[in-house]
UniProtKB/Swiss-Prot annotation:
The keyword Nucleus does not apply. Residues 409-551 are annotated as: Oligomerization domain. This is Carbamoyl phosphate synthase large chain. Mn(2+) 4 binds at E844, N846. InterPro entries: ATP-grasp (IPR011761), ATP_grasp_subdomain_1 (IPR013815), CarbamoylP_synth_lsu (IPR006275), CarbamoylP_synth_lsu_oligo (IPR005480), CarbamoylP_synth_lsu_oligo_sf (IPR036897), CbamoylP_synth_lsu-like_ATP-bd (IPR005479), CbamoylP_synth_lsu_CPSase_dom (IPR005483), MGS-like_dom (IPR011607). Gene3D superfamilies: 3.40.50.20, ATP-grasp fold, A domain, ATP-grasp fold, B domain, Carbamoyl-phosphate synthetase, large subunit oligomerisation domain, Methylglyoxal synthase-like domain. Mn(2+) 3 binds at Q832, E844. SMART domains: CPSase_L_D3, MGS. The gene is carB. Residues 955-1100 form the MGS-like domain. Residues 137-334, 682-873 form the ATP-grasp domain. It comes from Streptomyces coelicolor (strain ATCC BAA-471 / A3(2) / M145).
Length: 1102
């Protein structure tokens, strides 16, 4: 039955900023869906607050709204655009919850908008834990299989305590309703833990409801991805097995597809139950994902939960099988059936054929505990990983070792040298699931543990344990052999060993192993992902490496450009870099090159099989990239490799690639060194006559102390060659400096520590620019709202700048040009400046695409990444202006006076992390980056744009109520004006004694409240922390004091996180918030699409 004719326009809701549990996979699914719907001739309206996504590019939808995803704003868009239908299943939990509220408050009915892709009843049956239990019971009556864990629904703490007795005691699982990524869930082993976890769960659940369940810790966990159309055709797209047993959130687990340890009969049972559930719930046009637990002792099957939408697992399943779930879900939503949709990859089989795999896929999660030293690293049912890598191999060991190597983290690959340690101690360590458990298991095996002991400690299935033993046996063979023979190398490679691992075991250099391997002719071949186990020919070149017989890479005539992606998402290197890689691929395709993408992140648009001409799903290590370059050179001419778009990962490979004779295009490895190495960069600045803050490099504490004494404290210390401010700290005195040097283990003459003067009270400025060797194109100038010293990735910023004048822009332009020329950039460069008093200091330069490129491109309506890719391959700025890729006149520094103002705000993952005692982690911003994503607010005035950015990131700013203020002495003077404004807007102020005193002297009334350290008052007056916990505070302003006195502040800020109260930690943020509150109180806040903003900017240029 072909598509419906009664729908002309569709509103698609995106997933907003990247947070833990809801990441780039929704950009991938949303982009696919928008393209499909547009190709079907529908008008597509999109709302998504995240500018770093491909889906918010103006060409993907017909009208793109970068606005907060809240029922209020989405209603404004519906009123303006009047769509016929709303598709909410592609934007994760955010989109689903928003659609449910719009349905509930009558907005959809009022404007005559139909929900497609999922009906409200099906969403509720899948999401509401009580209704879902009934569904599972129905299924069991019909087919005799499948049950739910015994459970108890609670709406208050009294219910919760009763529930434990009803379930027969601890441990119990706590799960809140309608949350995502396991937010607020956990295992409680005693009453203290129960009160803490359930209290937070009741707060986080929009329906104040939590479910207590019997514990099924240690059971095997599986997932099925299914799709169903309105004619009741159902396909099982993929089965996924979790390597880690129940108790670890599936997003934090190593997962394997297809499932490895199910018997045929067990698999059929899961299939039957899954198909019966999707029918019973009533998902009739789209995909869903169902999670199961199987008791290894008696085979009892429990259905854990389902997601009636496109999820993180569906992105993984799509990449693992080549079956594009999101694309097909969008087609089903507008009326097609599965048998009418062709399979893109074979082009001769329909989508109703279930994919079959002749390879194994392994996904491994990437964590960021090093960014939150106080956080508890135990893995639980609350998701904590920030990214993932996927690898494909011909067997489990090969895919598994490739996945670990793809994580690009020190110590992520198995190591087989040195003493493993004490067996019993290692087994004890392996009992607690953490990000490094798998390495502890391998060391325990090396120390002589038996398979039974490993299983008892970890409950990892015996089949997987055997595979780990197999990997260790191969390592022993390499260690015992006298020489590297062709047979030995082939065997090691077939089990996923890297040259680096083989080199370490045999005591040789990595390059020596590679030379021997090439001399013996042991090289990988590349196989195609074809959805059908080679039964039909694949038309899309989507490759993975294997040490097999024949290669499937076809020869070509056109010159190829190889683009290195950014690998797994992590804090500091996220989807923004993927955005630049995808744009480069599009631009170079248009310019007549064959584009080749290399990446291993399954969540992204870059690893979609139709983004580039060829896709290699491979780790981004030197060995893997060199083999791909070799394979492509055999196939046809290679114009070069682009390393400057994928962030720090490919940048770090540039010199080694060049040394191996690979043509690196764009900014040369030498130029990268000139910007990254402080000594070399100092010389560039000196030649251009530009001031940098006083600094020096040190390799010992003595040297560091001498520099700090000469510069004066506070100083900023950091290692060289890092991204995301890794390991940076502002040091206020000598004792802390000594401790910092002692903790930084990796100091060496080639990797010194940098000591810079820290500029207090400076305005930080970020510039993105293009340089072709002759001419500079200033992409955009962003003025940070927070002061210098807070990592630029965590700071909010405004473009065009709000307090800089024409003279400042002139100076910035001249300095940027001087640096770009001195370093030798060809393409993009990002420079951070600090304006202190009247002096413009250069903080650092990055000779690559920065994380602000997508934001700058959207704010100025110019595709910077596309232009950069062309410049890398020799185009000039003048040529690109003539072609129309860049504006004919002017640039991002000459925007019209009435240009819209865009504000970027960073989104932090504080709420996901707890320390071992269950307290939150501190929310103070510093020089080390901790945000996972970003949102953008755009409007004609700064106040409204800032208010939108806050609404998109943390929920709307309060417009009345009680505000608590407590600031450090250095901030007291600058706090008076914004505080007075708050009172004028009708806020009631509360403050600690010191701050209240200053306010009173300035004629501002504030109620004095007790600090946490003072305890409850004699007449039971609550402390500020108790007031926050009781929901009596609407806005918190708390700036930290130097290094001491942080503890009171810490308690206040962690309480704010636990209760989701807006908490501002700088006076600058307070001043911006006041402008935002003012805008909200005064005016009707409107919405405009990016296309309308762009039309305005383009008209202003002519």
């Amino acid at each position: 039955m072909p598509k419906r004719t009664d729908i002309q326009s569709v509103l698609v809701i995106g997933s907003g900023p990247i947070v833990i549990g809801q990441a780039a996979e929704f950009d991938y699914s949303g982009t696919q869906a928008c393209r499909v719907l547009k190709a079907e001739g529908l008008r597509v309206v999109l709302v998504n607050s995240n500018p770093a996504t491909i889906m918010t590019d103006p060409e993907i939808a017909d009208a793109t709204y970068v606005e907060p995803i809240t029922p209020e704003f989405v209603e404004k868009i519906i009123a303006k655009e009047r769509p016929d239908a709303l598709l909410p299943t592609l934007g994760g939990q955010t989109a689903l919850n928003t659609a449910i509220s719009l349905h509930g408050n009558g907005v959809l009915e009022k404007y005559g908008v139909e929900l497609i892709g999922a009906n409200v009843e099906a969403i509720n049956k899948g999401e509401d834990r009580d209704l879902f239990k009934e569904v599972v019971e129905e299924v069991r009556k019909k087919i005799g299989h499948g049950e739910s864990a015994r459970s108890y629904i609670c709406h208050s703490m009294d219910d919760v305590l009763k529930g434990v007795d009803a379930l027969g005691g601890y441990p119990v699982v706590v799960r809140p309703s309608f949350t995502m990524g396991g937010a607020g869930s956990g295992f409680a082993h005693d009453e203290d833990e129960l009160r803490r976890i359930a209290g937070q769960g009741l707060t986080l659940s929009p329906t104040t409801e939590v479910l207590l369940e019997e514990s099924i810790l240690g059971w095997k966990e599986y997932e099925l991805e299914l799709m169903r159309d309105k004619n009741d055709n159902v396909v099982v797209v993929c089965s996924i097995e979790n390597f880690d047993p129940m108790g670890v959130h599936t997003g934090d687990s190593i997962t394997v597809a297809p499932a490895m340890t199910l018997t045929d009969r067990e698999y059929q049972t899961l299939r039957d139950v899954g198909i019966a559930i999707i029918r019973e719930v009533g998902v009739d046009t789209g995909g869903c994902n169902i999670q199961f637990a199987v008791n290894p002792e008696d085979g009892r099957v429990i259905v854990i939960e389902m997601n009636p939408r496109v999820s993180r697992s569906s992105a993984l399943a799509s990449k693992a099988t080549g079956f594009p779930i999101a694309k097909i879900a969008a087609k089903l939503a507008v009326g097609y059936t599965l048998d009418e949709i062709p399979n893109d990859i074979t082009q001769e089989t329909p989508a109703s054929f279930e994919p079959t795999l002749d390879y194994v896929v392994v996904k491994a999660p990437r964590f960021a505990f090093e960014k939150f030293p106080s956080a508890d690293s135990t893995l639980t049912t609350t998701m904590k990983s920030v990214g993932e890598a996927m690898a494909i191999g011909r067997n489990f060991t090969e895919a598994f070792q490739k996945a670990l190597r793809s994580l690009e983290k020190k110590g992520s690959q198995f190591t087989f040298v040195g003493e493993p340690g004490d067996k019993d101690e290692l087994l004890r360590e392996a009992v607690r699931p953490t990000d490094g458990r798998i390495n502890a298991v391998m060391q325990a095996i090396r120390a002589g543990a038996t398979p039974e002991e490993v299983f008892d400690a970890t409950k990892i299935d015996p089949w997987f344990v055997d595979q780990l033993f197999l990997i260790k046996e191969i390592a022993d063979e390499i260690a015992e052999s006298r020489e590297l023979t062709a047979d030995l190398l082939t065997e090691a490679k077939r089990h996923g060993f890297s040259d680096q691992q083989i080199a370490e075991i045999s005591g040789l250099g990595e390059d020596v192993v590679r030379q021997v391997r090439h001399a013996l002719g042991v090289r990988p071949v590349y196989k195609t992902v074809d959805t059908c186990a080679a039964e039909f020919a694949a038309r899309t070149p989507y490759f993975y490496s294997s040490y097999d017989e024949e290669s499937e890479v076809a020869p070509r005539e056109k010159p190829a450009v190889i683009i290195l992606g950014s690998g797994p998402n992590r804090i500091g290197q996220g989807i923004e870099f993927d955005y630049s890689c995808v744009h480069a691929s599009f631009a170079l395709s248009d310019a007549g090159y064959e584009t080749v993408m290399v990446n291993c992140n399954p969540e992204t648009v870059s690893t979609d099989y139709d983004t580039s001409d060829r896709l290699y799903f491979e780790p981004l290590t030197l060995e893997d990239v060199l083999e791909i370059v070799h394979a492509e050179q055999q196939a046809g001419p290679v114009a070069g490799v682009i390393v400057q778009l994928g962030g720090q990962t490919p940048l770090g490979l540039s010199q080694a690639l060049k040394d191996n004779g690979v043509p690196v295009v764009g900014t040369s490895p030498e130029a990268i060194h000139a910007a990254e190495d402080r000594g070399a960069f100092g010389r560039v600045l000196a030649e251009a006559g530009l001031p940098a803050p006083k600094h020096g490099t040190a390799t010992t504490f003595g040297e560091a102390k001498a520099i700090a004494d000469e510069i004066g404290y506070p100083v900023l210390v950091r290692p060289s060659y890092v991204l995301g401010g890794r390991g940076m700290e502002i040091v206020y005195d000598e004792t802390r400096l000594e401790a910092y040097i002692a903790e930084s283990t990796e100091i060496s003459p080639s990797r010194p520590v940098l000591v810079d003067r820290f500029l207090d009270d400076a305005i930080e400025i970020d510039v993105d620019a293009l340089y072709d060797g002759e001419e500079l194109y200033l992409g955009g100038v962003m003025e940070h709202i927070e002061e210098a010293g807070i990592h630029s990735g965590d700071s909010a910023c405004a473009l065009p700048p709000i307090t800089l004048g024409g003279f400042d822009i002139k100076r910035l332009r001249a300095s940027t040009e001087g640096i770009a020329k001195g370093v030798g950039v060809r393409g993009l460069i990002n420079i951070q400046f600090a304006l202190a008093g009247d002096i413009l200091y250069v903080l650092e330069a990055n000779p690559r695409a920065s994380r602000t490129v997508p934001f700058t491109s959207k704010a100025t309506a110019v595709p910077l990444a596309k232009a950069a890719a062309r410049i890398s391959l020799g185009a000039t700025i003048a040529e690109l202006r003539a072609e129309g890729l860049l504006p004919a006149l002017g640039d991002g520094g000459t925007l019209p006076l009435d240009a819209p103002i865009s504000v970027k705000e960073a989104v932090m993952p504080w709420s996901r992390f707890r320390d071992i005692h269950g307290r939150g982690v501190d929310t103070v911003l510093g020089p080390e980056m901790r945000s996972t994503g970003e949102v953008m607010g755009i409007d004609s005035v700064f106040g409204t744009a800032y208010a939108k950015s806050q609404a998109g990131a943390y929920g709307p700013l309060p417009t009345k109520g009680r505000a608590f203020i407590s600031v450090a002495n250095r901030d007291k003077r600058s706090m008076i004006f914004p505080a007075r404004e708050l009172v004028a807007h009708g806020f009631e102020l509360m403050a600690t004694s010191g701050t209240a005193e200053v306010l009173k002297r300035n004629g501002i009334n504030a109620t004095v409240v007790r600090k946490q350290s003072e305890g409850t008052g004699p007449n039971g007056e609550k402390t500020i922390v108790q007031l926050i916990h009781d929901g009596e505070v609407d806005l918190i302003v708390n700036t930290p004091y130097g290094t001491s006195g942080r503890l009171d502040g810490y308690d206040i800020r962690t309480a704010a996180v636990a209760r989701s109260v807006p908490c501002l930690t700088t006076v600058q943020a307070l001043a911006a918030a006041v402008q935002g509150i003012d805008a909200l109180n005064h005016g009707d806040v409107g919405v405009r699409s990016l296309q309308e903003h762009a039309a305005f900017l383009i008209a202003a240029r002519d």
